[in-house]
Amino acid sequence: MAVPKKKKSKSKRNHRHAVWKGKAALAAQKAMSLGKSVLTGKAQGFVYPIDEEEESEE
């Protein structure tokens, strides 16, 4: 006969949600930091291709 599974406690559910949200917040923070460094030109780990047209105009 089918028997319902035991219900997990709300504290376990809340803990799982907190871990997930914490990881998401950390990823968002890293993405914002990377975006800011790229926009300000302080990023050292990127190589940008320079178009020949831009060089000739300057």
Swiss-Prot record:
A Pfam entry, by short name: Ribosomal_L32p
InterPro entries linked to this entry: Ribosomal_bL32, Ribosomal_bL32_plant/cyanobact, Ribosomal_zn-bd
Record's GO cellular component terms: large ribosomal subunit
Gene Ontology terms describing biological process: translation
Superkingdom: Bacteria
Statement: the UniProt record of this protein carries the keyword RNA-binding: no
The keyword Ribonucleoprotein belongs to this UniProt entry's keyword annotation: yes
SUPFAM superfamilies the record matches: Zn-binding ribosomal proteins
GO molecular function: structural constituent of ribosome
Keyword annotations of the record: Ribonucleoprotein, Ribosomal protein
Record-stated family: Belongs to the bacterial ribosomal protein bL32 family.
Protein name listed in UniProt: Large ribosomal subunit protein bL32
